[in-house]
From Swiss-Prot:
Annotated region (G5), positions in chain: 489-491
Region (G4): 453-456
This protein's encoding gene: infB
GO molecular function: GTP binding; GTPase activity; translation initiation factor activity
Residues annotated as binding GTP: 353-360, 399-403, 453-456
Record field: compositional bias (Basic residues): 204-215, 236-248
Positions with biased composition (Low complexity): 105-170
InterPro entries in the cross-refs: DNA-bd_dom_put_sf, EF-G-like_DII, IF2_assoc_dom_bac, IF2_II, IF2_N, P-loop_NTPase, Small_GTP-bd, T_Tr_GTP-bd_dom
Name of protein: Translation initiation factor IF-2
Keywords of the record: Cytoplasm, GTP-binding, Initiation factor, Nucleotide-binding, Protein biosynthesis
Listed Gene3D superfamilies: P-loop containing nucleotide triphosphate hydrolases (3.40.50.300), Putative DNA-binding domain, N-terminal subdomain of bacterial translation initiation factor IF2 (3.30.56.50), Translation factors (2.40.30.10), Translation initiation factor IF- 2, domain 3 (3.40.50.10050)
UniProt xrefs under PANTHER family: TR-TYPE G DOMAIN-CONTAINING PROTEIN, TRANSLATION INITIATION FACTOR IF-2-RELATED
Family annotation (Pfam families): EF-G_D2 (PF22042), GTP_EFTU (PF00009), IF-2 (PF11987), IF2_assoc (PF08364), IF2_N (PF04760)
GO CC terms, sorted: cytosol
Length: 848
């Protein structure tokens, strides 16, 4: 140790210099001044003298008593409190420092045996003096076997001897984990835990505490306790506890934000988007509000909006097409068709043309049937599917409606056919639906065969038809084109065979093939809901063979084929390519034009159908929400739009679609049609109840209400109407909307009178003497006062007199006295009498 002066040593130990010089002399050292140096050996000699002089080596262990008083308040009621004072006293006894002699005398072989006792003896001493002890004393208790420890620890007792008053300051406050040690039941456990903490490093940590603690008690030296603690400590047997592990969560909070790749379909609800990003829905809604979009948790978002929200929240969006999932499922449930033998199949022919041009009558002659007579009003309102065995081969026909409302139906007919027969009346020429049929066929890429019908009439002019169609780029073969024109007569049967030959010739050019061994695949032509049969779908098989018992997916519906019938109503077990059949067993009525296919896995079929239903519902909700947002600001400040609520029930799905489209096209900015419910099948009580709740009109197209529904309609006084012709339904709705329009009034001038003089009457006040110059002046009609041909007042007549008599009217060329109510007229003014005439408005709509 480096030498220090007496003055420095006195400052270190905190004693006066004179006293320290006196103690140096008493210790037998050479006398010196305060600036003389003191060596390390002299320090040790001085320390030994001081210890001996103060009797520290032989004295009893030094005691330290700690007292603690805590005061708390307990509430014994609303207004009563009790003060509780807890007083605690602890006495810690520190034994003399361990001497190095016993350790030096102890033989080496005995070290493993004595190690537990030697190690645990200081453990007993440490809790009494500094179990929660000062860091300066920790090396003292942990290294009793080292001789050099005595030299290191020597200055500390010297300081303690010099100033014993600072001894209590060496004991720090307990660490946080032992704050509850002052509770009596825990005292013994704390001692065991302290003993376990000082086990040498070479032993495993499991031996620090636990049930092995009590086994080492016989080896321990007795623990000296104060009288206050002795009784409480020995009250219960010692039972050690495992040292509690550090209380930490197993999950550690990530230091960096989690960035996820979020798959976003075409439509997704706010709740689903929040779940995929692992954030709260409120955060997504808040972000949307910041972007100017007001949304709820169940509202559907489009893909672009969802991508913006995802990027705003710090995640990576990935746009996903819903068709990918559908195609994946389709590839799983429909096997590949490669390698299966293909055979020639019959052509599917769609008969199209303008209304009343003879399409159905032409088919009747081909099928030797009378279908047209069965159609209401003599017009076709459904797609009919038939297959005909002719001398030249089998042909499947689709008869489409010609009315303007059935545009979508005709488009579907063109999409699922191979050849289009365009029927044009020779006496009528090309009409709007004829042009539309040409456009449908051209957009579908289907060849056309023109049938010029009604050739038996005298006014038939086939050349005119050719000229008009050539303007639509339908060029006949004899004019150098590629379209066959066949003159026919559905009435006499002229040219029918030629027409079939032309169709089959066109089919040979197309080389139509199909594989009968593949899984059935085709298109839904029509669907309906029939009492006793359930959902009935007319399907056209385009490839494969459909058998009874097959699992079928059609649009968003699925089911097992329980029965199949042909167009004549005969039961069939299977249907090959190009054969139309009616199937029973679907769980709903699919839309006309939906694709159907037979599958082997019922689970996958159900999964695909439910996926399509969910997608349709989300798209519908999204359209409704978009319409609300678009019209929100447009409708602000405007009068409320009047709506005609309609409950619509039809016999087949195609008619439902056509009527719905036609009704939605009606209306304008003032009145609109709102279809609150629509469906296929008869009118049930639920439909009537809905009409009651929404104050709606019930329309039945080729369907009827049951007895209970009729009774409810009569009781509630609802409006129930049946229709079989689409014209009549649309006309009635148009008339109802017209009646809902605000009336317009036209002002007609009925008479003009010039003011010639003004005089005052005691009874009427100011009276104008007038001459009627035009028309007739009536007493009870509104008037205007004109001055210099400018209207300055508008009001009513207070009185109209001729001479002294009150009159109802004064004709042209006669004088009269006119009292104007609330206004003073002057000479030269004109009094104009007019009448307001109500003008009935007509509904202008694009769908009419």
């Amino acid at each position: 140790m480096a030498e220090v002066t007496v003055k420095q040593l006195a400052a270190d130990v905190g004693a006066p210099v004179d006293r320290l010089l006196k103690q140096i002399v008493e210790a037998g050292l050479k006398a010196r001044s305060e600036n003389d140096a003191v060596t390390s050996d002299e320090k040790q000699q001085l320390l030994a003298y001081l210890r001996k002089n103060h009797g520290e080596a032989e004295a009893e262990p030094r005691k330290i008593t700690l007292k603690r008083k805590t005061t708390t308040t307990l509430k014994a009621g609303k207004a009563k409190t009790v003060n509780v004072e807890v007083r605690k006293r602890r006495t810690y006894i520190k034994r003399a420092e361990l001497q190095p002699e016993p350790e030096a005398e102890a033989p080496a072989p005995e070290e493993p045996v004595q190690a537990p006792a030697a190690e645990q003896a200081p453990v007993e001493e440490a809790p009494k003096v500094a179990a929660e002890a000062a860091p300066a004393e920790a090396p003292e208790t942990e290294a009793p076997a080292a001789a050099e420890t005595e030299a290191k620890a020597a200055p500390e007792p010297a300081a303690e001897s010099a100033e014993p008053a600072i001894a209590p300051e060496d004991i720090p406050m307990p660490p946080p984990e032992d704050e509850g040690r002052d509770r009596k039941p825990k005292k013994k456990k704390e001692k065991v835990r302290e003993r376990g903490d000082d086990i040498e490093e070479g032993k495993p940590k499991k031996k620090q505490a636990g049930h092995r603690g009590p086994r080492s008690r016989p080896v321990e030296e007795p623990v000296v306790l104060s009288e206050d603690e002795e009784e409480t400590t020995l009250r219960k047997p010692l039972r050690a506890k495992k040292k509690p592990k550090e209380k930490r969560h197993a999950f550690e909070r990530p230091t960096k934000p989690m960035v996820r790749e979020v798959q976003i379909p075409e439509t997704i609800t706010v709740g689903d988007l929040a779940q995929r990003m692992a954030v709260k829905s409120a955060d997504v809604i808040k972000t949307l509000m910041g972007m100017g979009v007001m949304a709820t948790i169940n509202q559907a978002l489009d893909q672009e909006t969802a991508i913006l929200v995802t990027e705003e929240l710090g995640h990576k969006p990935k746009a996903v097409s819903e068709d990918a999932f559908e195609e994946e499922v389709l590839s799983e449930i429909t096997g590949p068709d490669e390698g299966k033998e293909k055979i020639k199949r019959a052509p599917v022919v769609s008969v199209m043309g303008h209304v009343d041009h003879g399409k159905t009558s032409l088919l009747d002659h081909i099928r030797r049937a009378k279908v047209a007579a069965g159609e209401s009003g003599g017009i076709t309102q459904h797609i009919g599917a038939y297959h005909v065995e002719t001398e030249h081969g089998m042909v499947s026909f689709l008869d489409t409606p010609g009315h303007a409302a059935f545009t979508a139906m005709r488009a579907r007919g063109a999409q699922c056919t191979d050849i289009v027969i365009l029927v044009v009346a020779a006496d009528d020429g090309v009409m709007p639906q004829t042009k539309e049929a040409v456009e449908h066929a051209r957009s579908a890429g289907v060849p056309i065969v023109v049938a010029i019908n009604k050739m038996d009439k005298e006014e038939a002019d086939p050349d005119r038809i050719k000229n008009e169609l050539s303007a639509l780029e339908v060029i006949p073969e004899d004019w150098g084109g590629d379209v066959q024109f066949v003159p026919v007569s559905a009435h006499t049967g002229m040219g029918i065979d030629d027409l079939l030959e032309a169709v089959l010739l066109q089919a040979e050019i197309l080389e139509l093939e199909a594989s009968p061994d593949a899984a059935a695949k085709g298109v839904v032509v029509e669907s309906s809901l029939e009492r006793g049969r359930g959902s009935v779908a007319t399907v056209l098989v385009q490839n494969g063979t459909l058998r009874q018992g097959d699992m079928v997916v059609a649009g968003s519906f699925f089911g097992k084929v329980r029965a199949m019938t042909d167009e004549a109503g005969r039961q069939v077990k299977e249907a090959g390519p190009s054969i139309p059949v009616e199937i029973l067993g679907l769980n709903g009525t699919p839309d006309a034009g939906d694709e159907f296919f037979a599958v082997a896995d019922e689970k996958k079929a159900k999964e695909l159908a439910e996926f399509r239903q969910t997608r349709e519902r989300e798209q519908r909700l999204q359209r409704q929400q978009a319409a609300k947002l678009e019209n929100m600001f447009e409708n602000m400040g405007k009068d409320e739009v009047k709506t005609l609520n309609v409950v619509l029930k039809t016999d087949v799905r195609g008619s439902l679609e056509a009527i719905t489209k036609a009704l939605q096209d009606l209306g304008n900015d003032e009145v609109q049609v709102k279809i609150v419910s629509s469906g296929v099948g008869g009118i049930a009580e639920t439909d009537v109840s809905l009409a009651m709740a929404t104050n709606a009109v019930i329309f039945g197209f080729n369907v009827r209400a049951d007895t209970a529904s009729k009774r409810l309609v009569e009781q509630e006084g609802l409006d129930l109407r049946y229709y079989s012709i689409i014209y009549n339904l649309i006309d009635d709705v148009k008339a109802a909307l017209t009646g809902m329009l605000k009336p317009e009034f036209r002002e007609d001038i009925v008479g003009i009178a010039d003011v010639r003089d003004v005089f005052r009457s005691p009874k009427f006040g100011q009276v104008a003497g007038c001459m009627v110059t035009e028309g007739t002046v009536y007493r009870n009609k509104p008037i205007r006062v004109l001055r210099d041909n400018v209207v300055i007042f508008e009001g009513e007549l207070e009185s109209l007199r001729r001479f002294k008599d009150d009159v109802a009217e004064v004709r042209n060329g006669m004088e009269c006295g006119i009292g104007v109510k609330g206004y003073d007229v002057k000479v030269g003014d004109q009094i104009e009498v007019f009448d307001r005439v109500r003008v009935e408005r007509q509904l202008e709509s694009t769908g009419a």
